[in-house]
């Protein structure tokens, strides 16, 4: 057990973000589970990547943090494509519909759904290194197809 405060984590993230930004880059982070999403935003992260397939509802618990992220040009990277055998049960349409439900939940907290869509990146829920080549290829194909489908729905 390590006792680390929220302020400690935010300070460390801000230090890293400042270094990344000083080089002209953006800082992104991935969380495989649930977390207090505002810590990442308060820490200066530009791209918050999360497992939206299993934990997508949790981001709606932090609408103020998402507003802050969007206001400074940041993005949510929605890991809506499962990086597990569940990918065999999904299609681009089912995953786009899943994203729509999650975006609707976030929009119900007062965010503009069009802005949510504009500042979204579609990703896998986690890495694919432990999966078969076939499942990995399916995952990356579904990322592209789901993204294209949502771009078409939103006109960009």
Model-derived features with residue positions:
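Active-site loop segments of alpha/beta catalytic cores
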Residues: 1-63, 82, 90
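Catalytic-face loop-and-helix region of soluble metabolic enzyme cores
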Residues: 46-156
């Amino acid at each position: 057990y390590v006792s680390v405060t929220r302020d400690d984590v935010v300070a460390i993230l801000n230090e890293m973000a400042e270094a990344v930004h000083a080089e002209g880059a953006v800082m992104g982070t991935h969380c495989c589970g649930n977390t207090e999403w505002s810590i990442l935003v308060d820490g200066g992260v530009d791209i918050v990547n999360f497992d939206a397939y299993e934990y997508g509802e949790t981001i709606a618990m932090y609408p103020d943090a998402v507003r802050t992220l969007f206001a400074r040009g940041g993005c949510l990277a929605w890991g809506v494509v499962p990086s597990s055998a569940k990918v065999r049960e999904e299609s681009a349409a089912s995953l786009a519909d899943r994203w729509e439900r999650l975006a609707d939940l976030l929009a119900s907290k007062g965010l503009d759904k069009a802005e949510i869509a504009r500042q979204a990146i579609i990703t896998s829920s986690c890495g694919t290194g432990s999966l078969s080549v076939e499942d990995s290829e399916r995952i990356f194909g579904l990322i592209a197809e789901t993204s294209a489908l949502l771009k078409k729905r939103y006109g960009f």
